[in-house]
């Protein structure tokens, strides 16, 4: 992950996206902040400030899907991965997301797609960012998704529901034309 930083180097500032915001009753978009170099800070929080690229974030999520390993290198133990993607709050509602979700160590976990009205599989784990970054890992479908928008306010568009619906439909269409098989026999007819 060569392009993930808390303090973006000045040499890479031309790769930082501007921040936009939705405004007014017609939902128009305007520039909020152009890319600027910020002096390095010393606070590295888990809640904000990390800058990355789609490619780097995808690699991280692929490592999570692989159980802590990427390209033959182990970064996290299977036990650590399991702790990160297991629900630790029981059947309590997740404040931000509502019913049908659980909470792991660093991820929101989709526990009940029906209650959550999501198109993803149970056990899908995901996280979002302040400027409508969304990424999820669906272990059942062996799928990683990353989308970055750089638009605020957060949650103006429900990317998790919208993008997961599109991805799920693509999987259904793929299965329709190339049905999965078990021992050579199609499992969908």
Ranges and model annotations:
Residues 129-131:
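Short, small/polar residue-rich loop motifs at catalytic or cofactor-binding pockets
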Residues 13, 153-154:
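Flexible, glycine-rich phosphate/dinucleotide-binding loops
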Residues 121-125, 182-183:
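Short intrinsically disordered coil segments
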Residues 66-70, 80, 85-93, 112, ...:
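Short, gly/Ser/Thr-rich active-site loops of penicillin-recognizing serine hydrolases
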Residues 1-122:
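Short, surface-exposed loop or secondary-structure junction motifs
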Residues 108-109, 136-138:
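Short, well-ordered beta-strand micro-motif
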Residues 135-136, 142-151:
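Short, well-ordered beta-strand elements
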């Amino acid at each position: 992950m060569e392009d993930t930083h808390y303090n973006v180097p000045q040499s890479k500032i031309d790769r930082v996206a501007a921040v936009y915001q939705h405004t007014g009753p017609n939902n128009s978009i305007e520039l909020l902040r152009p890319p600027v170099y910020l002096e390095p800070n010393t606070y590295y929080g888990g809640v904000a400030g990390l800058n990355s690229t789609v490619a780097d974030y995808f690699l991280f999520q692929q490592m999570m899907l692989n159980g802590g390993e990427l390209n033959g290198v182990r970064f996290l133990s299977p036990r650590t991965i399991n702790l990160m993607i297991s629900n630790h709050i029981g059947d309590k509602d997740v404040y931000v997301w509502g019913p049908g979700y659980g909470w792991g160590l660093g991820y929101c976990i989709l526990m009940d797609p029906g209650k959550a009205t999501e198109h993803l599989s149970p056990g899908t784990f995901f996280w979002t960012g302040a400027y409508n970054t969304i990424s999820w890992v669906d272990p059942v479908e062996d799928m990683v998704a990353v989308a970055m928008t750089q638009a605020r306010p957060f949650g103006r568009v429900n990317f998790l529901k919208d993008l997961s619906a599109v991805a799920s439909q693509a999987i259904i269409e793929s299965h329709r034309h190339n049905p999965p098989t078990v021992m050579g026999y199609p499992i969908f007819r």
